[in-house]
Structure formats: C-alpha cells, structure tokens
Regions:
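Von Willebrand factor
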Residues: 1-42, 44-87, 91-94, 111-121
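Conserved NTP-handling cores and scaffolds of large molecular machines
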Residues: 17-20, 74, 127, 131, ...
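Arginine/glycine-rich "motif VI" loop of SF2 helicases in the C-terminal RecA-like domain
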Residues: 18-21, 76, 103-106
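Short secondary-structure capping/turn micro-motifs that flank functional sites
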Residues: 33, 140-141
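VWA/integrin I-like adhesion module and closely mimicked acidic/polar interface patches used
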Residues: 90-135, 142
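A conserved amphipathic helix/loop scaffold
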Residues: 141-148
C-alpha cells in the first residue's frame, strides 16, 4: 500500500478516531496483522496516522487473518454497533477463504478503490457486507458517513 491508497487509509483512521475517540482500532495487514491502535490502547490519533503513513505494502494478503483479528478487537468494544471497515481490493493471496470470517462479523463494510473494485464487490456480495468505492482520500468522509 502506498500513495493514494495509503492516504485513504490515513484519512479513514483519523475519521474513525474522531467519530469514536475511546472505542476504535486500526489494523494493517499483509501475510500478518499489525494493530496500529488496539481496542484498549489509548494512543493519540496523530501517532496512529503517522505510523500508518510509514507503512509500505509488501508480500501476500491474508484477508481471513485480518478479519479474525478485527473480530478479536471488537470483542473488547463497548459499542452497541461493532463495525468492521475493510479498506481493500479483497484479493486474498494467503491463508484460507475469508468468507466464513467475514460472515461472523456483526457488521462489515468493504470500501474499495474505485479503479480496482471488482473482486471487492464480489467478496462483499458473498459475505453479505455493505460495499462502497472511493476514488481518493477526499471520498472517505462521505463513505464513512454512509457506514457510521
């Protein structure tokens, strides 16, 4: 992940922190998952965004692992709605089929790049998830407003 997709993720993380200042998580994933801000961590949003902006995409994508990590984070949430927002093209290249993990989540929203959304749209349809596309970071507020 780099460039515009990284900017999209940074804006999304900042928006989530603003919307639910005490009850949010940010996970980055490839073949493993990294909690940039776990559910019970009180990190400043700016530190989370800075860490996100330092990431560089690499390797394979374990979507199942990412969704299971999200479920573990949300187990600690006090929110009435436990929403997973997945920013991804949804091409799982490692791990097992992520559909079962996706269907176990309370509420899943898939937000995909509008120029690379076909696999994500199909994944969302099969998982029973809501779906949106974004053309850039400026589209994130409207996409998140629809979600939250």
């Amino acid at each position: 992940m780099s460039g515009e997709r990284l900017a999209i993720a940074a804006v999304a993380a900042a928006a989530c922190s603003w919307r639910a200042p005490a009850d949010w998580s940010v996970l980055a994933f490839s073949d493993r998952q990294l909690a940039l801000k776990s559910q019970d961590d009180r990190r400043p949003p700016a530190a989370v965004v800075n860490d996100l902006l330092r990431l560089r995409g690499r390797g394979t994508t374990d979507l199942d692992g990412a969704l299971r990590s999200s479920a573990r984070q949300l187990e600690r949430s006090r929110a009435k709605r436990r929403v997973t927002i997945l920013l991804s093209d949804c091409r799982a290249t490692a791990g097992v089929d992520p559909q079962a993990a996706a269907r176990r989540l309370d509420e899943l929203w898939v937000i995909a790049p509008e120029d690379d959304a076909d696999d994500a749209a199909e994944f969302a349809r099969r998982a029973g998830a809501r779906f949106a596309t974004v053309g850039g970071a400026f589209d994130i507020p409207a996409a998140l407003a629809a979600v939250l």
